[in-house]
Amino acid sequence: MSSIQSIQSRIKTVQSIRKITHAMELVSYSKLKKAKTAFDEVEKYNLLIDQTFNKIFENISHDDLKELMKSRNNSKSKLYIIVTSNLGLAGAYNANVIKLVKETVTSDDYLIIIGSYGVRALRQQYNEQIINLSDITTSKRTSTLVSKIIKRAFKYYRNGAVSSINFIYTKFINNLVQEELCEKVFPFDEQMIREHIDRKEIDYKLEFEPSAKDVLADAIPLFVDSKLHLAMATSLISEHSARRSAMENATRNSDSLITELDMEFKRKRQAKITNEIIEIVSGADAV
């Protein structure tokens, strides 16, 4: 059985760990609030992009739309842009994304990995398939990072190296639920186009020069760019939410362990005192 001194040492260790996990919980909560504010701004931007594309879809013929949207090659390869975090200690956030990657990606596919955690987890297995590696950057540099990634993705698509561009990321549902997704973003499928055309939220008229088809052809990378911004924003919320929950659980477990150790310490101390009293009484009786 543990000695009183070792129990005291364990209590101090757990108390120190609790201070760290509680501090990380508070930091994650603060970052979560900021991430939600940033997501709201990105979502507004995406809504504007969606509305503009809805109007373009309304002003382009079905044949022209199919011509623009159809895959330009017969490549068996797909491109996956994977969003993870730079840091760990976020529960199953990164592990779930990595698991989905391994279930989805084949040996013919190509990867662009965002987040150093994903780089570390996937580099060895998919080294020959990775075409770009990036850390998560500050918000001021995110636009530059996204722009470079989308340009590279479309270069592979236009060269016929891949037949589609896909995202693997984590969608924020609520503070307790985050869902990892694999989402095809280009070429658009007919169902997505139909959903856009059926929306009627725009009540103003747009004119296109030289034509809606030409505008759409040039604007497609901008659309995919906006979707990657959104995927990264919702992934960031998911990361901070998962880390806050993980640290909250760790703090709660520390409290429980401290309570158990404290009770064990008191039992040990009481037993020691009782034994000392018995020894004193026994010694007195012997005299």
Swiss-Prot record:
PROSITE patterns: ATPASE_GAMMA. Pfam families: ATP-synt. InterPro entries: ATP_synth_F1_ATPase_gsu (IPR035968), ATP_synth_F1_gsu (IPR000131), ATP_synth_F1_gsu_CS (IPR023632). It is a peripheral membrane protein. Keywords: ATP synthesis, Cell membrane, CF(1), Hydrogen ion transport, Ion transport, Membrane, Transport. It is found in: Cell membrane. GO terms for cellular component: plasma membrane; proton-transporting ATP synthase complex. GO terms for molecular function: ATP binding; proton-transporting ATP synthase activity, rotational mechanism. One of its GO terms (biological process) is proton motive force-driven plasma membrane ATP synthesis. SUPFAM superfamilies: ATP synthase (F1-ATPase), gamma subunit. Belongs to the ATPase gamma chain family. HAMAP family: ATP_synth_gamma_bact (MF_00815). Produces ATP from ADP in the presence of a proton gradient across the membrane. The gamma chain is believed to be important in regulating ATPase activity and the flow of protons through the CF(0) complex. F-type ATPases have 2 components, CF(1) - the catalytic core - and CF(0) - the membrane proton channel. CF(1) has five subunits: alpha(3), beta(3), gamma(1), delta(1), epsilon(1). CF(0) has three main subunits: a, b and c. This is ATP synthase gamma chain.
